[in-house]
Amino acid sequence: MELKGKKINFLGDSITEGVGATDPEAMYVNIVKHDAELAEARNYGISGTRIARQSNDEGSAYCDRYKKMDEDADVVVVFGGTNDFGHGDAPLGTMADRTPDTFYGALHTLYSGLTEKYPRSAIAVVTPLHRVGEDNPRGDGSKPEDGALLKTYVEIKREV
């Protein structure tokens, strides 16, 4: 797909927001904007946010935030899941879930909402990057012993 002159909405967490970038031009959203010669690169990244709703959410979950994004995007990029793994308290759920309170259900809610809101737009889903502790079922240490590994979250994103 030719991206030159297109408008892209980037929905994500701290990686999308650009936390840790030493210069705004080093943020991945701005690198894509420059390299692809986009008309607009809209950054909807918020540090620490998750795809699924959490017990103390306050509307920051991706499955809720997409509703507030600009509607004229040619492409929507969804980059997340690492915080659901690392310190999220929503259960994984099952493929049959359609509630935003489980990881499976939140993905269904998000994807169906995006395809309805952006029927003519391309939607790109980016799976979580490798990270420290990805083989720890407790994520960043706050989850139960029987938690899922990061690769499980990646597999679920691909499955849904």
Model features per residue range: what roles?
Residues 11-12, 126:
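Short hydrophobic segments within beta-strands
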